[in-house]
Amino acid sequence: MSRSIKKGPFVDKNLFKKIQAGDNKHQIKTYSRASTIIPEMIGFTINVHNGKTFVAVYIQENMIGHKLGEFAPTRKFISHAGAAKVGKK
């Protein structure tokens, strides 16, 4: 279910203040994975927390409308051992 249009997109107020006041030379750290990417964020590098570390996300024009958490995966993919990896006796 999408967010109501009359409410507008959610952006963490502290993150929004840093973007309004800051220059895009330094990276901004945030834990707010639910914040929506807005046009004012283009050109910034935002470090998004994935539960363990911060993942650097460079904001581009085609990311507008998505959430920050979409670009910082929380799970590490480890494939199962295949037949080539397992040695036979």
Curated annotation (Swiss-Prot):
Keyword field: Ribonucleoprotein, Ribosomal protein, RNA-binding, rRNA-binding
One GO BP annotation of this record: ribosomal small subunit assembly
GO cellular component assignments: cytoplasm; small ribosomal subunit
Gene Ontology MF annotations: rRNA binding; structural constituent of ribosome
Keyword rRNA-binding part of the UniProt annotation: yes
Keyword match Ubl conjugation: no
InterPro entries cross-referenced by the UniProt entry: Ribosomal_uS19, Ribosomal_uS19_bac-type, Ribosomal_uS19_CS, Ribosomal_uS19_SF
Protein family membership: Belongs to the universal ribosomal protein uS19 family.
Record's protein name: Small ribosomal subunit protein uS19
